[in-house]
């Protein structure tokens, strides 16, 4: 692995983050052959925010106007991609406040809230309400894990006021939650 001078590393770090704002400090450390603390110090010196803040910024710039059914700050997790009436993706980092203290397992309502708010966000109308949800928790999620929820809208059926959204949540490549959300929607007057 090539060793970079501090100045070169910081320039390349800035380019790497501009190209992929979702890259982690750990991935950057591996890429540049340094420890994570060095990457953090470089980010601070360059006034580059941590990953969580970069994700929030990208989401607020790209998706704040796209989501009509609820304010972007009411979405549980960070939306990283959305195509109204088609699909959406969000991420949720499980922290200490989301888990049971004794076993560090995430409380189920956080996983449900991420999936349900993503199903709501993908609806292109001002009013979107969950009429029915069928959810299956496949495996426990633990503190420190990152949940990636992916929503897909099914093609319209006869009842145009109801749309079915399927959500699958993953930790890595492993499914942790499967959900089917029936969403009532209308344009408010």
UniProtKB/Swiss-Prot annotation:
The keyword Nucleotide-binding does not apply. GO terms for biological process: fatty acid biosynthetic process; negative regulation of DNA-templated transcription; negative regulation of fatty acid biosynthetic process. One of its GO terms (molecular function) is DNA-binding transcription factor activity. Keywords: DNA-binding, Fatty acid biosynthesis, Fatty acid metabolism, Lipid biosynthesis, Lipid metabolism, Repressor, Transcription, Transcription regulation. It comes from the Bacteria. Signal peptide: none annotated. Transmembrane segments: none annotated. SUPFAM superfamilies: Thioesterase/thiol ester dehydrase-isomerase. The keyword Endoplasmic reticulum does not apply. Belongs to the FapR family. Transcriptional factor involved in regulation of membrane lipid biosynthesis by repressing genes involved in fatty acid and phospholipid metabolism. This is Transcription factor FapR. It comes from Listeria innocua serovar 6a (strain ATCC BAA-680 / CLIP 11262). The lineage of its organism: Bacteria, Bacillati, Bacillota, Bacilli, Bacillales.
């Amino acid at each position: 692995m090539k060793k970079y001078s501090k100045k070169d590393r910081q320039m390349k770090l800035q380019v790497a983050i501009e190209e992929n704002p979702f890259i982690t400090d750990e991935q950057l450390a591996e890429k540049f052959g340094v420890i994570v603390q060095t990457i953090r110090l470089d980010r601070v010196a360059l006034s580059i925010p941590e990953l969580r803040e970069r994700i929030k910024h990208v989401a607020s710039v790209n998706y704040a106007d796209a989501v009509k059914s609820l304010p972007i700050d009411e979405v549980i997790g960070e939306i990283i991609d959305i195509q109204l009436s088609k699909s959406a993706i969000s991420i949720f980092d499980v922290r200490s406040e989301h888990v049971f203290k004794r076993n560090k397992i995430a409380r189920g309502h956080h996983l449900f809230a991420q999936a349900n708010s993503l199903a709501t966000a993908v609806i292109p109308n001002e009013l979107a309400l969950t009429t029915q949800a069928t959810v299956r928790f496949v495996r426990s999620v633990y503190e420190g894990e990152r949940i990636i929820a992916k929503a897909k809208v099914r093609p319209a059926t006869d009842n145009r006021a109801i749309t079915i959204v399927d959500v699958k949540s993953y930790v890595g490549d492993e499914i942790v939650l499967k959900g089917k959300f029936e969403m009532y929607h209308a344009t408010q007057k």
